[in-house]
Amino acid sequence: MFKKAIKKALNFVRPLASGYLYYDHKLINSLSTTILLNEDGDLLTTKKVASLFAMQDELRDVFKPILTEIQNTSERKKTKILKKYGIENTTLITVLNILIDIAENPGKVKIISHKYLDLAIIQIENKENTFKSQMPKFYQSKEIGESVCIVGFAFPEYKAFKEQANYELIATNEIMNFPIFPISAMITRNIYDDQNHITMFEMSDGIELGMQGAPIVNTKGEIIGLVVGNKNIGPRKLSYGIDSKTIIEFLKENNIKYEEVKNEK
């Protein structure tokens, strides 16, 4: 049912690869999902995913001077400094985020967050070297009982990061294979947000870790929403997403280019 829709989604679904380095040198790979919106390289995802870039900057600003301070000290002084700042083996020291297949050199990023929904736009600094692709089309119509497909990235089985001296992470590009993971579901209910507006909807199946920010597409491959996360109702795991009507309003407010299918069905 969704074979053609998934092929379409391959044109605009992009992974965000993240490396998490802890004080005990444990390195964890993570994946998130974004949607390429236009030829400027603007991306749509959740606010939580976009916040990883702020986390990267904050950790660097906090720990770089501390690591420099303990670099050439005795073990006794090092222990005192670590205790002073509350640093343990499980303390997260460094995060490195890499946008995949967006531009030759994306540069710095700017984040535009929705006022209260888990929705954000990522804008790259260098827009002239973006990789060209077929852009998505948003469709505002949806129905309870409609079959949909969530097309994102999960199960981060890759090796993209390497630790250098003093807890620096670099991208190795050693293994950069990011297969998509589609999940089919059915729209079950509309959801009111905290402002008492219907901006979201519920789906009959849950998503896997890493799929937050993935597009929810209909059988034609048109985006009818963006998946935000899961919720548990008894023993059952359901997912929910923000609808295209709300997304389009957000894009218009911020003068972001996008394509839309008019409701002619």
Regions found by a protein language model. Give the residues of each.
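Catalytic nucleophile loop of clan PA
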Residues: 35-36, 206-227
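Flexible, gly/ser-rich surface segments that form the specificity/activation loops bordering the active-site cleft
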Residues: 133-199, 207-209, 227-239
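Conserved active-site neighborhood of the chymotrypsin/trypsin-like protease fold
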Residues: 40-53, 94-160, 197, 206, ...
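Conserved hydrophobic positions within beta-strands
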Residues: 36, 108-111, 187, 216
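Catalytic histidine site
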Residues: 12-80, 231
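Conserved catalytic-core segment of clan PA serine endopeptidases
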Residues: 3-8, 26, 59-130, 137-139
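C-terminal subregion of chymotrypsin/trypsin-like serine protease catalytic domains
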Residues: 43, 51, 217-265
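Beta-rich catalytic cores
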Residues: 30-31, 118, 212
